[in-house]
Structure formats: C-alpha cells, structure tokens
C-alpha cells in the first residue's frame, strides 16, 4: 500500500548535481513515495539519474516513480502520467504490475473509470494556487466525494504546505503530493518531516 506523503523531485527546482543530496534529505524526512519529474530532460538523462535515486529509495523502502515515460518507469517502481502523456491502456501494458498513477485534475469520473481499469493511485488538483500546476481550482467537495467512492489512494496536488496538508486530510484526501514547499525550503529534511507529521496527525 502506498503511503500518504508523496514528494515530487522536480528538475525545475533541483539541479541534476543536487538531486541525490536533496533526495536523501527527503527520504530522511519521511517521504513515502518519490517521483522524479524532469519534463525537459531527454530519456537517457532521466534514466541515469533515476538509477542513482533508485538505490537510495530502495534503502528506505520508498518507491521511485518516473513522471511520464512508462518505458523508463518499468525499470524502477512505476510511472505517473497526465492527459498529454501516453494513453492509460498503453502505459498499463508496458508497466504490467508496476505502479501506475494518473493525474485526474478535478474529474472524479475519470478516476472511477481508471479504478476499474487497474490504476494504482490518482492525483486531483487541490483547491490552492500552485507554482507548478496551472489548473482549474477544485473544491474540497471533490475529496469528500472521492473518499466515499474510491478504493485506491488519491492525492491532492498543488500548493500544498504543512497547514494545507492538514486541511486536505481533514477534507478526505488519502494523501498529498508536495513540490515547492519541500524543494524550496531551507531545511528540506525538516520541511518533509513537518508535512509528514501534519498528515499523519490529521488522519
């Protein structure tokens, strides 16, 4: 079962040379799932960095998810796809039993449909403004409703910090996906730990 704190290591915030160091701090802080998102990197570079991150993640029993590229994700723990990426059925074919997560934005119907097709988890847009996600804001009702009908983990993404993590869990989210509140923090390990504590104390 996937844990509740999902951290995205994004190349927009972290230089390639710092990835391992930052990853280690995130893992020490207690992240449950780690995703490598490097939208502007070519595949060879993603694969090379992922191999190094995967060793660290494995030491902490944390899955490493690759944003997009199921052909790379299958070498590690799995992939996460959005609507501009590869179709779900094709990704599932490549990944087989590996983790496959999908961005559902503010669409619960898509999530329900994917649940029947064997998606591992889904992510919904949080109601908060976010520096990394351009989106329609979704309300808390989406999460309250999702809690009633989804059997899979579902994460809130977008503008999540410590206080908002608490709020999202109270409004029904299974977990939260965090980018800038951790990657831009002066103390990455401490920020990760505080958000983790906020989540698990709000369940």
Model-predicted regions and their roles:
Residues 1-88, 93-120, 152, 160-166, ...:
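Conserved N-terminal beta1-alpha1 strand-loop-helix module at the mouth
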Residues 83-89, 126-149:
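Flexible, gly/pro- and Lys/Arg-enriched active-site loops
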Residues 130, 144, 163-164, 180:
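Basic, gly/Ser/Thr/Pro-rich low-complexity segments located predominantly at protein N termini
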